Amino acid sequence: MSSARTPLPTLNERDTEQPTLGHLDSKPSSKSNMIRGRNSATSADEQPHIGNYRLLKTIGKGNFAKVKLARHILTGKEVAVKIIDKTQLNSSSLQKLFREVRIMKVLNHPNIVKLFEVIETEKTLYLVMEYASGGEVFDYLVAHGRMKEKEARAKFRQIVSAVQYCHQKFIVHRDLKAENLLLDADMNIKIADFGFSNEFTFGNKLDTFCGSPPYAAPELFQGKKYDGPEVDVWSLGVILYTLVSGSLPFDGQNLKELRERVLRGKYRIPFYMSTDCENLLKKFLILNPSKRGTLEQIMKDRWMNVGHEDDELKPYVEPLPDYKDPRRTELMVSMGYTREEIQDSLVGQRYNEVMATYLLLGYKSSELEGDTITLKPRPSADLTNSSAPSPSHKVQRSVSANPKQRRFSDQAAGPAIPTSNSYSKKTQSNNAENKRPEEDRESGRKASSTAKVPASPLPGLERKKTTPTPSTNSVLSTSTNRSRNSPLLERASLGQASIQNGKDSLTMPGSRASTASASAAVSAARPRQHQKSMSASVHPNKASGLPPTESNCEVPRPSTAPQRVPVASPSAHNISSSGGAPDRTNFPRGVSSRSTFHAGQLRQVRDQQNLPYGVTPASPSGHSQGRRGASGSIFSKFTSKFVRRNLSFRFARRNLNEPESKDRVETLRPHVVGSGGNDKEKEEFREAKPRSLRFTWSMKTTSSMEPNEMMREIRKVLDANSCQSELHEKYMLLCMHGTPGHEDFVQWEMEVCKLPRLSLNGVRFKRISGTSMAFKNIASKIANELKL
């Protein structure tokens, strides 16, 4: 795919020239009147469309963009659609957005989120991408704790393979962190968010300080110029440490403190970390960037290939693209496409509806998905029911073998931007029936520890997933589950020594550690105090803060990382409220310490106030970074140090599970079932059963009670705590507490679910919006008062 392309120009990051549509394609894009997303208000049963995609729900939201889960109408494949409001971005941010799209177009690796289609109008940009249903690695670690080294190795091999592939193409990511590592349905890694990526040339230094501070290389804090790959290598070292230990190697209560620790390069080695893993970390976390290992060298490391002696990790070789797959071509011809436009779109890399359909026809969203393609007919009769008629030149396609029902104008108009068309209720119903239940996909996951990076015969297609790694999502016994799910290791205490377990290792890059070899298979049930820690002194009199910043401040930029539906995610957290004080975690999210930022963004106000970089004055924005509800074991860290806030210098992403007609904050009606629908729908509602899915649960929120009795108890407790709620599904409530616009306002879901393989039901909590402190306070109170 790359052989047909000219090298990507390195964008001058200070250049503010207004970009043009030519950034996205060599041919002019169609204008906004070519695309009409239907308003959901046109019919109670209709869902909005963008081109050939039915928009299902919002799964992420920011200041200037939304991410929606969508289904490709012709193939039935799920995709993530990033909808970006270009009118809200300045010229510099637009340039970075277009650069991100250009870079995504040339990347074709099984562990990198695949771009399928780009739809552009005068005011909006739609990026249709691979949907990673497993969520973020960050959330997985919060829910399940650290990974065993065997599992971490499988994931890390995929990560290194993908990043090394980028470096092969002279592309540096510059924002590698656990939040930008997604998991697909088979628990394989998908690297996302190339918003800060750029092309590099050795000798032509980059000088932009961007990324997440805990993952940032020391030379970035020092304001030094860099080639590119070495900053990714440092970030990979932080990621490896995070996977294996469940905590960050460098942390602090504010940016100044974090900077000092990174520049010292000291980090603790947990007692359970193997010597091989420790030695590998020393190749990543080296203060001198010129002495840092290359990824080609890292691939040959002993730890990387344990259990893979016959399959040593090697640089990924991108296969030649297969643009003449007869099976897909014939299917598309039967839809009404012509062979000429199929070849033109593929060879020209148009990333239009034709190319997207071809890619999706060969794309497997899961190892469990068979080769059978279920195509959805688009009969002409449906046009009579259309509330948003298509342009006159657009003729509906059919799965009939007759290719005459096909428009021809887009061959002359360049890359086609699909129009939005209304479809009959029957067609929508058929599409809904084709959707594979999440629980089926979850329960059918394979368990294997190998992580081979296969050759892909086509960009983004038949991308055989690496053999899935073991999933720890299965419900364990009570004792095992509690200890294994105890989230992340204790943060190194400031100004005081921590209790050690016989041996302490303070590792400095290049120095010899005194850590003895330890088995990677240490029982997760071992007491938490048996952890190595370091005492880090703070020097408040030292120079603080970031390196010299650019003159042009950056505005928030859109992230193209596709988000997943949080409901069925393996990382949807339950509130653990049993027993004494909850455990603490190193992994608060939504705080500035975890925010990706650019050099132009200033933090002097917070530093002058000596506030922790996770605790700042509350933002009045309605787009706060509401995330998944977290288990009680992660709450006291927020209580003691961090408060979630909207400090992301990109989009403050917010996961929502709400109807399309809802936006921001709305008043919820207490206990009202949707009044629309016919008798059949009401009957189906009455007969609905709780979903069976994996989620983090505690003994306090599980019960052998009937689901309906549990719902009555939940409503009773909600009413007693002055919470408003709305019945979204039979066993799911949308809840609200506090005053909209105030810090105490929070929205969350409560759902009664069946625990797989157990004769128990559990209550799943998931935060939608509001600060983690507000959510923790009300959710813990409700969980404690439930009599289940």
Swiss-Prot record:
Ranges where the UBA domain occurs: 323-362
Record GO terms (molecular function): ATP binding; cadherin binding; lipid binding; magnesium ion binding; protein kinase activator activity; protein serine kinase activity; protein serine/threonine kinase activity; RNA binding
Biased composition (Low complexity): 511-525
Region (Disordered): 1-46, 373-632
Catalytic activity, EC: 2.7.11.1, 2.7.11.26
Biased composition (Basic and acidic residues): 433-445
Catalytic residues as annotated in Swiss-Prot or TrEMBL: D175 (proton acceptor)
Keyword field contains rRNA processing: no
Cofactor requirements of the protein: Mg(2+)
Positions of ATP binding: I59, G60, K61, G62, N63, F64, A65, K66, V67, K82
Biased composition (Polar residues): 27-45, 418-432, 467-486, 495-504
Phosphoserine PTM sites in chain numbering: 40, 91-93, 212, 274, 409, 456, 486, 493, 569, 571, 592, 619, 722
One cellular component (GO) term of this entry: nucleoplasm
Reactions this protein catalyses: L-seryl-[protein] + ATP = O-phospho-L-seryl-[protein] + ADP + H(+); L-threonyl-[protein] + ATP = O-phospho-L-threonyl-[protein] + ADP + H(+); L-seryl-[tau protein] + ATP = O-phospho-L-seryl-[tau protein] + ADP + H(+); L-threonyl-[tau protein] + ATP = O-phospho-L-threonyl-[tau protein] + ADP + H(+)
Outcome (variant: T596A): Loss of membrane dissociation and binding to YWHAZ
Protein keywords: ATP-binding, Cell membrane, Cell projection, Cytoplasm, Cytoskeleton, Developmental protein, Differentiation, Kinase, Lipid-binding, Magnesium, Membrane, Metal-binding, Nucleotide-binding, Phosphoprotein, Serine/threonine-protein kinase, Transferase, Wnt signaling pathway
Activity regulation: Inhibited by PAK5; inhibition is independent of the kinase activity of PAK5. Activated by phosphorylation on Thr-208. Inhibited by phosphorylation at Ser-212 and Thr-596. Inhibited by hymenialdisine. Specifically inhibited by the H.pylori CagA peptide FPLKRHDKVDDLSK that mimics host substrates and binds to the kinase substrate-binding site.
Domain notes: The UBA domain does not seem to bind ubiquitin and ubiquitin-like and might play a role in regulating the enzyme conformation and localization. Activation of the kinase activity following phosphorylation at Thr-208 is accompanied by a conformational change that alters the orientation of the UBA domain with respect to the catalytic domain.
Family per similarity comment: Belongs to the protein kinase superfamily. CAMK Ser/Thr protein kinase family. SNF1 subfamily.
Protein name: Serine/threonine-protein kinase MARK2
Organism whose genome encodes this protein: Homo sapiens (Human)
Gene: MARK2
